[in-house]
Amino acid sequence: MKKYVLALDQGTTSCRAILFDRESQIVGVAQKEFTQIYPQPGWVEHDPEEVWSTQYGVIAELLARYQVTSEEIAGIGITNQRETTVVWDKHTGKSVTNAIVWQCRRTAPLCDELKMKGLEPLFKEKTGLVLDAYFSGTKIRWILDRVPGAQEKAEKGELLFGTMDTWLVWNLTKGRIHVTDYSNASRTLLYNIKTLAWDPDLLQVLNIPLAMLPEVKPSSTIYGETAAEGLFGHPIPIAGIAGDQQAALFGQACFAPGMAKNTYGTGCFMLLNTGEELYESRHGLISTIAWGLDEKVIYALEGSVFMAGAVMQWLRDELKLIETAGDSEYFAGKVADNGGVYLVPAFTGLGAPYWDMDARGAIVGLTRGSNKNHIIRAALESMAYQTRDILEAMEADSQLPLQLLKVDGGAVVNNLLMQFQADILGVEVERPHCIETTALGAAYLAGLAIGFWSSKEELRDKAKMERSFKPQMAEERKEKYYQGWHKAVRQIME
């Protein structure tokens, strides 16, 4: 009897395996961290073999710990850290060098060079992305330049590229399948999100052979089966793939245009479903593919805030104002409001929609009456203001008024922050019962492809909300606070 869908969540710091039942409830979780490699400042790498062995290990641990047999698993869904780049030898299955992680800045000079040649508009128009070291394309170029003989081998079709989803599928199928999905392909700087094909012009600019790129398929389809001689002992369909942020959008059941989710982690990642319409941002956001499903491609606008939970870490580790991030709610709640104090966390510059990399952080509006609680409250509120900045840019780009914001990530347990977020946006904020929205999204995509669940409507009905926060603040007061934030931002940009 097929009772479960297995989600593999290959993240930036850990690999996880999570089992979901037909009610989309979590049956079991196994997780293990792997090594972060920092060869020099600004560089970040992972060892692909270690990532695979860690992922393999957590699957084995999950099955053993919860006494689940592979016969009970209907299918597998995969979600992954996006953009991280692996290049491996087709014949040996071994990577030619460490994976270059999405956070790695080593290809920034190459991006600058391409911008100087006036190529950024070409990339933006075809891929929806900005020319940045974040995305995979320049990482592939770096590997082909630095590994002896790599370019020649790639041209002969002897080397393969993949993001982490592709690498896991290759290993799960013992090298039989080289595939990715629309959402991951759309993060490479090489995939044309309008024609839905690897773009010959962009491949030519970066001199990347088409032969090394995976086949691109919808996010919910049977890609193939696990090797019978592998971990599971018999074939299991691999039926869902999506990049982590897109998977979270799907896991939050943001199926309709105008629905958005915000993940509050170290930074914030916001995605707005724009339906089958592709909007090109005029406000520094990126356009991306959310997923491919039911013969349709769904697009999204994405914006990120660099500093969210990281501000709480700063209050804890550097300023020593709190002992744990959770303390922030207690101290912030001891004052009625921010007392005119604003904290602009531009520690590494300001992201969307300002894009000022030279700006630096500041605490403004201090008076003799300001105390530690005001500063802690201002730090919390900065997450909500930055979220509104991005959502206003999304509304301006798409003309889609936000109906509801779904939230996930570590900071959403903070009720004061969630209520303030609802107040400052003027829309309802929903916190889900299942906070594992990324893994749930991968499970949903796989489950739909194999008939484990019948439709998106069924999934929407299963989505359980833990708590809803409705706006309570008067309009005039809300706008006064937000104007104060803008004034503080202007001060650090001058």
Swiss-Prot record:
Q: Cross-referenced Gene3D superfamilies, in alphabetical order?
A: 3.30.420.40
Q: Which domain of life is it from?
A: Bacteria
The biological process GO terms on file are: glycerol catabolic process; glycerol metabolic process; glycerol-3-phosphate metabolic process
Residue numbers binding ADP: T12, R16, T266, G309, G410, N414
For the ligand (ATP), the binding residues are T12, T13, S14, T266, G309, Q313, G410
Among its keywords, does the record have RNA-binding?
no
Tell me which CDD domains the record gives: FGGY_EcGK_like
Q: In which pathway does it act?
A: Polyol metabolism; glycerol degradation via glycerol kinase pathway; sn-glycerol 3-phosphate from glycerol: step 1/1
Q: Which residues bind sn-glycerol 3-phosphate?
A: T12, R82, E83, Y134, D244
Molecular function (Gene Ontology), one example: ATP binding
What PROSITE patterns does the annotation carry?
FGGY_KINASES_2
Q: How is its activity regulated?
A: Activated by phosphorylation and inhibited by fructose 1,6-bisphosphate (FBP).
In short, the EC number is 2.7.1.30
Q: Does the keyword ATP-binding apply?
A: yes
Question: According to the UniProt record, which cysteines are disulfide-bonded?
Answer: none
Q: Which residues are noted in the entry as glycerol-binding?
A: R82, E83, Y134, D244, Q245
Catalytic activity, reaction form: glycerol + ATP = sn-glycerol 3-phosphate + ADP + H(+)
Q: Which UniProt keywords apply?
A: ATP-binding, Glycerol metabolism, Kinase, Nucleotide-binding, Transferase
Q: Where is it found, in Gene Ontology cellular component terms?
A: cytosol
Q: What does this protein do?
A: Key enzyme in the regulation of glycerol uptake and metabolism. Catalyzes the phosphorylation of glycerol to yield sn-glycerol 3-phosphate.
Query: Which family does the UniProt entry place this protein in?
Result: Belongs to the FGGY kinase family.
Describe its assembly.
Homotetramer and homodimer (in equilibrium).
Q: From the Swiss-Prot or TrEMBL record, give the protein name.
A: Glycerol kinase
Q: Which organism is it from?
A: Desulfitobacterium hafniense (strain DSM 10664 / DCB-2)
- Taxonomic path: Bacteria, Bacillati, Bacillota, Clostridia, Eubacteriales
* Gene name of the record: glpK
